[in-house]
């Protein structure tokens, strides 16, 4: 019989975060706290912040992957807002999701209307407008 107070014979196990249990990088605890503080509902279930965190992490990973590809296409090693804009606007589903979102310093997609492009001329034919 051991003397003193406390738990005898048990070793303390390090606590595992809910993010680690779910295999996520984003913080489940912080999302849960923000859901509670935001007055979205009177009560928040234990699975809701895990699900929401996983959705947020997936969306962030998807956007960052496409933005990284856009940066690599432009021979840059750092993602800037322009790359985020190009990634989102060139992806049909992300463009639909973030259609009303304005990205600061994002610029616009390069687009020239078909009517403004020069006309394709036939072989050897001289245009009437160039004859004098």
Swiss-Prot record:
InterPro entries: Histone-fold, Histone_H2A, Histone_H2A/H2B/H3, Histone_H2A_C, Histone_H2A_CS. One of its GO terms (cellular component) is nucleosome. The modification Phosphoserine is found at residue 129. GO terms for biological process: DNA repair; heterochromatin formation. Phosphorylated to form H2AS128ph (gamma-H2A) in response to DNA double-strand breaks (DSBs) generated by exogenous genotoxic agents and by stalled replication forks. Phosphorylation is dependent on the DNA damage checkpoint kinases MEC1/ATR and TEL1/ATM, spreads on either side of a detected DSB site and may mark the surrounding chromatin for recruitment of proteins required for DNA damage signaling and repair. Gamma-H2A is removed from the DNA prior to the strand invasion-primer extension step of the repair process and subsequently dephosphorylated. It holds the Pfam family Histone. Keywords: Acetylation, Chromosome, DNA damage, DNA repair, DNA-binding, Methylation, Nucleosome core, Nucleus, Phosphoprotein. The modification N6-acetyllysine is found at residues 5, 7. One of its GO terms (molecular function) is protein heterodimerization activity. The modification N-acetylserine is found at residue 2. The [ST]-Q motif constitutes a recognition sequence for kinases from the PI3/PI4-kinase family. In contrast to vertebrates and insects, its C-terminus is not monoubiquitinated. This is Histone H2A.1.
